[in-house]
């Protein structure tokens, strides 16, 4: 009987029930909420499902992301499964591969046809710099503030990339979760701001059809952008270079297999690895603290200011072009592709169902992807990374 009792006691102590804290249960509840939003309400399911499941796993079994250890005899013990996934985040491998996949799926035609979209895409990065100074005011050091501020660009991979490059790995989980959460909430956060700073007359403005873009222009675009941006800011090469390489695969027309692989199989594999590893970085000990709350608030402020900056410049462009530009497309300058462009289309269609703004909004939207990468490169240059 003693043996059986001891065995049962040992088994009981090996279960998660006796080893988890209240914080773990809170994080498990957050994971369930994310899964509900992703599955029931279709809030960015490709991102939220793996993130939520990684969050669930690490709070049931924290050792799944444990580091490699060496015992007193010098014997090395392997780390947890998610530790090896997470190394790919810290080394900026997964974010860069995500950018390649995004490039392979993106049509830069609307941006080429309307180069002024570059300016609106840049204006929507205002939230990044507002958040940077606010984060410093909140007590974060410069590198942490820079990593947090990228949330304002609504760009998860760039947030992870910069946090890793600046050595802010302890903040990577909260930053990534905040960035992806706000990306999924674009249709909820942006419309009130867009409507507040535009009149119904503004929202009804119809824009002229974009000019056709030649194949040669589409081929030259990624090459020129790579040379110009990477010469000015070499630190952007991993992100901008991979983004433009993926786009060159798409547009050159001679590497169909590479285009299909980059935009489908590789992209989804990387999303699984990135999502689960980011989710697994949100253990209760790492996530439930005051810094996380600050990051969530700063991220929301940054995102709102980014939307405001885009709409404000859209209003300026409307005045300069004598009413030829609908200011709603400015809000699409955040790099949540293509969600932000769809929101511009939806808000415009609410004012006038015959108004079709999607392709016009895609210009600032894809410009925002480049703009966020440039902002990250600027911070890396400032801090000598």
What residue spans do the PLM features occupy?
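N-terminal alpha-helical transmembrane segments of multi-pass membrane transport
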Residues: 1-71, 77
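Intrinsically disordered, low-complexity non-transmembrane regions of multi-pass membrane transporters
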Residues: 1-19, 25, 71-78, 192-221, ...
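Entry/N-cap segments of selected transmembrane alpha helices
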Residues: 32, 110-132, 283-310, 361-365
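Interfacial helix-loop-helix linkers and transmembrane-helix boundary segments
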Residues: 39-48, 68, 84-85, 105-120, ...
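Alpha-helical membrane segments and immediately flanking helix-loop junctions
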Residues: 91, 99-105, 120-130, 134, ...
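Alpha-helical transmembrane segments
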Residues: 170-188, 298-306, 329-332
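Membrane-embedded hairpin module used as a gating/binding unit in multi-pass transport
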Residues: 178-254
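Transmembrane helical segments that form the transport core of multi-pass membrane transport proteins
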Residues: 226-313
